[in-house]
Amino acid sequence: MTCSITELAKKLISIPSVSPKDLGCQDIIIKRLCAIGFDIKRVNVNDTKNFWAFRGTGKTLTFAGHTDVVPIGQDKDWQTDPFQPVIRSGYLFGRGSADMKGALAAMITAAERFVNKFPNHKGRLSFLITSDEESSAVDGTIKIVEYLMSKRDMIDYCIVGEPSSTNIVGDVIKNGRRGSITANITIYGIQGHIAYPDLADNPIHKGLPVILKILSIKLDSGNDFFLPSSINIANIHAGNGFNNVIPGSLFVQFNIRFSSEVSEKHIQSQIVNILNSNDINYSIEWLFSGKPFITKKGLLIDTVIQSIFYFNKKKPILSTSGGTSDGRFIALMGSEVVELGLVNNTIHKVNECVKISDLKLLSCMYEDIMKNLLS
């Protein structure tokens, strides 16, 4: 079993599928799923490859994931070729090993074993796979969700294979994520010589008090599932590097991660009210990444906890920390969504790697969840 998982992971890692490119990863996965009786629906959009695979009918358990990876960074910083997977000291090295081609290999091999043992399983087992998770995410999972919703074909339970674990596989699972919205604000002044400030209008001087007011907004106090919402500056820029020029504009980018206690409209109104109450000329662009979502205790969480406890003899921590994930799109269907994946301490880093034993453990957990929900 370990060999099968490892070999599949190595095949996927060897393909340089930097987002949103797939470059053949999904063909490998689809071939294996077809061999065990899955029907396939491709939902490709622009440069993004997506597919929906399903087997059986009834209550639906979906495993969701992505074949794309982030860029490698500086090649010289890698100890090995990031797209030539290497096993060393019990670890599999390569870009995507932890995020999340290793988890994809664990899912597929788990499904193969499950179908072999339970060829007439109850319910429907399915896969939702995209190559646009690490970049814009506009042509990926959301397009499959829209396709399914147009057919009134809903997902009941979904396991997202994102690397949720901290120290050992299954020590942390994500039962929700915060929402995310970005405000790109440009404050306008009048460019001029810095020795003649009376002939110019410095947007930095005007903008700093406004920025501090925005940062001081208290949106909420959080709740049982989410920490308080946070506002942070992601980027700020003014001027052209010359020390004798008052710039004509100031750009500042705020990112807000928000709990279920507030809406994106409330956040927007709070920020716009501050901007309008000050004597400034500004423009603002909003980029909305997703609403917060939460899966409360129910059949899926109970089943996932049960499977993790069976192997680890310890229950996982339920968390909503971290960035956004494609779970936010699947949650739009009213699905119960849980993220369970590999250890995340090397994701997006040089020398990304995963324990071979963790691949085996995760695959066993996935198979046990299938068995408990569908056999």
From Swiss-Prot:
The active site is at residues 68, 133. Pfam families: M20_dimer (PF07687), Peptidase_M20 (PF01546). GO terms for biological process: diaminopimelate biosynthetic process; L-arginine biosynthetic process; lysine biosynthetic process via diaminopimelate. Zn(2+) 1 binds at residues 66, 99, 162. Its EC number is 3.5.1.18. Belongs to the peptidase M20A family. DapE subfamily. HAMAP family: DapE. Catalyzes the hydrolysis of N-succinyl-L,L-diaminopimelic acid (SDAP), forming succinate and LL-2,6-diaminopimelate (DAP), an intermediate involved in the bacterial biosynthesis of lysine and meso-diaminopimelic acid, an essential component of bacterial cell walls. Homodimer. This is Succinyl-diaminopimelate desuccinylase. It comes from Buchnera aphidicola subsp. Acyrthosiphon pisum (strain APS). The gene is dapE.
